[in-house]
Amino acid sequence: MNVEHHTFSIAGRCARTGAFGVAVSTALPAVGSAVPWVGPDGAIATQATTNTSLGREGLRRLADGVPIAEALAALLRDDPFSNRRQIHGVDRAGAWAHTGPDCKPWCGHRVESGFTVAGNFLTGPDVLAAMATAFVADESAELGERLLRALEAGQAAGGDQRGRQSAALLVWSPEVRPHHNLRVDDHADPVVELRRIFTVMHGFLETLREDYGEGLGIYRRPKL
């Protein structure tokens, strides 16, 4: 599937817990259905002229032990529209990003230790700088919280120059939590709404813990 997702996003990992995640927002509906791809071996965001198979196949290659730089670069070599793709992500050992020369300006990415940020059709580079600063500000916080703070900072710095409509947070963690898979598909202020839902689900988890310990195993990852 190819859809134009002019957007800003962050992919990150938590060295403390082994979690991976992506947070993203755009001025189109249902961004969470296409851009974020997350699993036990890494996190990938595929955007601009979005090809969802890049995310799906990228995770499969990470599961096979292929480093993320090698996995994503190989997929783009076989992609006739790589000049219009923006893709970035992290695995357990590294991080990698690609912004095609035909992505809508302002566009760009940053590859940092343990995370990547990228965007296209943005108000400017300050969006990514703000996201990076917010993500590293408190490394003791859980990954979902850090990703959401980065998304909020990117929106506050200008975000998508066309406006705003949807947002999503997707996290893989050894400890499954109800606030790890959240989508706002159509809203006037999606990042604010994503924060509201995140807070609600945090409260729901605490209620389960108070009443049932770990919630009767509802959010326990099965041992395979």
What are these regions (language model features)?
Residues 1-224:
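N-terminal nucleophile
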